[in-house]
């Protein structure tokens, strides 16, 4: 998800406020944006890798649900082609 949305402070705070993220969800999102791997998150936040992946899936679902109600949140890139075009 960190590659699917161009995260900045405004977008991050808007999403956190609209989606009513839990503390765990917010921490997972912030650490993903900072570049932590799923394994790092699991180790440092005392969770299993599957729990981190489950939370990431929940965050993506919440983003898709609240994005349509915000003028600030951009649509999430959904295809490999879109992400490839940004990189090259």
Indicate where each model-derived feature is located.
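Short alpha-helical "recognition helix" segments of helix-turn-helix
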Residues: 40-45
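Short, basic, alpha-helical segments at the C-terminal edge of helix-turn-helix-like DNA-binding modules
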Residues: 68-82
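Short helix-to-turn junction characteristic of helix-turn-helix DNA-binding domains
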Residues: 31-35
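Short helix-coil-helix linker/hinge
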Residues: 18-25
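C-terminal flanking helix
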Residues: 60-68
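Short, Lys/Arg-enriched N-terminal segment that forms or immediately precedes the first helix
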Residues: 3-18
């Amino acid at each position: 998800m960190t590659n699917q949305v161009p995260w900045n402070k405004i977008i991050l705070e808007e999403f956190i406020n609209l989606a009513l993220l839990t503390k765990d969800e917010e921490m997972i999102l912030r650490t993903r944006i900072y570049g932590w791997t799923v394994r790092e998150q699991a180790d440092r936040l005392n969770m299993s890798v599957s729990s981190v992946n489950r939370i990431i899936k929940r965050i993506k679902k919440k983003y898709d649900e609240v994005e349509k109600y915000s003028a600030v949140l951009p649509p999430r890139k959904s295809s490999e082609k879109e992400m490839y075009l940004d990189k090259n």
